[in-house]
Amino acid sequence: MEPLFPKRLLSIAVLCVASATAQADTGMNPDNDYWWPNRLSLEPLRDSSLSADPRGANFDYNEALKDLDVEALKKDLKQVMTASQDWWPADYGHYGPFFIRLSWHAAGTYRMIDGRGGADGGMQRFAPLNSWPDNASLDKARRLLQPIKQKYGNNLSWSDLLVLAGTIGMEDMGFPIVGFAFGRDDEWEPEEVNWGPEGQWLTDRRHSGDRKLDKPFGATEMGLIYVNPEGPHGNPDPIAAAHDIRQAFGRMGMSDEETVALIAGGHTFGKAHGAHKPSDCVGADPEAASMEEQGLGWTNKCGKGNAEDTVTSGLEGAWTVSPAEWTHNFLQNLYAFEWELTTSPAGAKQWVPKGGAATNMVPDAHDSSKRHAPIMLTTDLALKEDPAYRKITQRWLEDPEEFTRAFARAWFKLTHRDMGPVSRYKGELVPSDTFVWQDPVPVADYKQIGERDVKKLKAAILDSGLSTSDLVKTAWASAASFRTTDMRGGANGARIRLAPQKDWAVNQPQDLQRVLKVLEGVQREFNKKSRKTKVSLADVIVLGGAAAIEQAAKKAGHKVEVPFFPGRTDASQEMTDVSTFAWLEPKSDGFRNFHAEGYKRNPAEALVERAALLGLTAPEMTALVGGLRVLQANADGSQHGVFTDNPGSLTNDFFVNLVDMSTVWKKSDTEAGLYKGLDRNSGKVKWTATSADLIFGSNSELRAIAEYYSQSDSQKTFVQDFINAWSKVMTADRFDLK
């Protein structure tokens, strides 16, 4: 396989320059982004996925999976592995290493900071990922799998197939896999992701200070999955490479041991391809290729254009003596030789055994009469030269079985990291073991509460002395940690009472502990009186929010029932990966009018990002903010954005007063980011607000929604829309209901 890190969104400024140039040259009509490049984009909230899906709105992939013949699929995949095609011959007669790289690069874009990337959705099929330099030649791997996808149709997603192919390839080459979970559904259009600020491939403007990687990025250069295999910026320094590796893999939630296992295990298979200079031979990437190429790119005009003439990363050679078998040879070779720097035929920097040793060790991938020396990359030598990595590789050099187990677990984590909890795992290959990185929750060993119990609990909660604000804030804090990007967070597990979530500034830890103590008392009293039926704290927290909203709606003259579905359980601290869960902490949450000091992103932009992570649309975001303001759900208890004289009542007052022309808004003279709403005639301060409030009046799209909710005939509609959006957030992590 290729090295694991060989050599679309541009920044707004770069896009604008490019757009302006293109329009000047071609006469294209300027769009809104051209005229107003700094306007708030609501694109992350557009729900166009259903309209883009040709399978129809009623298609359910999990249902379709029930008809998948997994054993037949595995058999077919194993046949593909050794059925070498003339248009793209298999190295060593086996496509397994090629498919491992395919699977790795499908999953390896995942980054822990915002949960974006990963294999779910099959995004490698679309730009920009299909044309990243790091993904060169993987278009051919997908075409090799196309007959499999055609045969199994809707019962097998591309997302699952892209990951399964490499996993079965490893198994077919003698590696004992942990297992595999189906359940990744396909998207039908590319996700808009900020992959970096650079305007050119393989460039780097994402580091600061002592080569600290900017957030939220995981890769070190534009168009890479992880790091430059030749070393940072092509500098063949293994220690410097180790720094980059640790950062990049750490951004994916991998420990040192997992990182070493993945690199050493992955490079046990296959080879790198650099038979010629890419600039002399290789054509445009798939997205830029001519129409007759039909979605294939990187056409190679040198020699055969494939096989022994293949050009992918520019690096050339294999690491082991048996590249199509699982062996211990990578680590053996790493320590058996002293390595000296050389260059590949393409001019890339790589390493070979010193003094011309072992030149007859590695078989050629296509010509049985030829043999070669093994290679190492600068990033491979980092596993020997970095002190921490060296301890690991030396231990595994002496214990091949431990190395095998470590790689199996790390591979499973790599390829399932963005799937969320085990409840989303489907199929007969799912392992029985669970891992802390899956954010597990216990299985309930008691009877769930019924309607009568719900009524009793609501009454007890409302009689507990907690305010509407207390209950709404706590329920929101518990559920709104959820991210649709990697299905982490949410109310299930009641992790709001555990580290690190209990200490997040946005959750106001002291107030939170006060509220949780009362709710735990309600839970304890109920469970004490019931033998078989129990309630979790996770359910009590969500139920408290529902009860408070129903009471607030009643105050406003609306009799409503907030949907509630019991079944959540309470996780333990041991079930919570504190270090990775910490990345879910919001530094800005416009729904609670919270913005951490020093956080650079504009509060309005951060609000849209938070809404996107929750899977909300623009109307849902608008309804929630308007409702949460009048219910006094601000994190710090401030009155910013509380545009009502009747706080605690679920009214449309936020919108009525926001669009009221008797108010004129001015920036505060004393506090940055704060605005004052003055009576237009008297000049008296009526309200205070942040940009997370006023954006609903200044942005034309959001104002249209706000004006709608301000109408006299929209009060009932607003209340119901708020409840619907609230319930969507409360049940976002309830995959058992979907």
UniProtKB/Swiss-Prot annotation:
Site positions for Transition state stabilizer: R101
Superkingdom of origin organism: Bacteria
Record-level Gene Ontology MF annotations: catalase activity; heme binding; metal ion binding
GO cellular component, one term: cytosol
Keyword RNA-binding on entry: no
This protein's UniProt keywords: Heme, Hydrogen peroxide, Iron, Metal-binding, Oxidoreductase, Peroxidase, Signal
Name of the protein described by the UniProt record: Catalase-peroxidase
Cross-link Tryptophyl-tyrosyl-methioninium (Trp-Tyr) (with M-252) placement: W104-Y226
Disordered: annotated segments: 191-213
Naturally occurring in which organism (per UniProt): Saccharophagus degradans (strain 2-40 / ATCC 43961 / DSM 17024)
Encoding gene (name): katG
Keyword Iron found: yes
Residue sites binding heme b per the record: H267
Assembly notes: Homodimer or homotetramer.
EC number, as in UniProt: 1.11.1.21
